[in-house]
Design a protein with these regions (language model features):
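Conserved redox-cofactor binding core of oxidoreductases
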Residues: 50-169
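Short, intrinsically disordered, charge-balanced linker/junction segments flanking boundaries
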Residues: 167-177
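N-terminal glycine-rich phosphate/pyrophosphate-binding loop and immediately adjacent elements
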Residues: 1-65, 173-174
């Protein structure tokens, strides 16, 4: 009911199995069914996009937008925002088993990181979560509390195409009439 039920084509390297790709079918999209881990891409990947000609898509270009959207509860540094609509806090499901896993990784030579979204990305850490006081923060919860005047929400409607006038979206086409 809340998942589109997508699967990959058969994967020859995986005994011809199809891989399930959960995708949310509700306001908030996949943020209603994902693992709620808040982790950004590796800065070098964004910088590679910029080097390939995507001006404005380097890490330093995007970091202000990441920070603007983030409402971190506990992080107070140059990599995080604290006033954004998407609330982020340390994952609450941090058990003794999680702690033992991190200790084992550190004992075997992996670096402990305090923050996966800071400047270093290779290591082991407790993750941040898109939750607030233990409640899932979907993109619908984050961005639709105050619905903008220029936004009309259609539920139980499948969009087949976005209509554009040059670079501006001016409407939609639906399969539901």
């Amino acid at each position: 009911k809340f998942d589109w039920g997508y699967q990959s084509v058969k994967q020859t390297q995986l005994n011809n199995r199809k891989i399930y790709f959960p995708r949310g079918k509700a306001l908030g999209g996949s943020s209603i069914v994902n693992g709620m881990i808040y982790i950004r891409g590796v800065p070098q990947d964004y910088d590679n996009w910029r080097q390939m000609g995507l001006d404005g898509w380097g890490y330093s270009d995007l970091l202000p937008y990441f920070k603007y959207s983030e409402g971190s509860i506990n992080r107070k540094n140059k990599f995080h925002g604290n006033r954004g609509p998407l609330k982020v806090e340390p994952a609450r499901n941090f058990s003794e088993l999680d702690k033992a896993f991190i200790k084992a990784a550190v004992d075997s030579g992996h670096e402990f990181l305090d923050d996966f979204n800071a400047d270093k990305r290779s290591g082991v850490s407790r993750v941040d979560s898109t939750t607030y006081l233990g409640v899932r923060q979907s993109s619908a919860i984050a961005y639709l509390k105050k619905i903008p005047k220029n936004l009309k929400i259609f539920t139980n409607t499948t969009v087949s195409r976005i209509l554009f006038n040059k670079n501006k979206a001016i409407g939609i086409e639906t399969t539901d009439g």
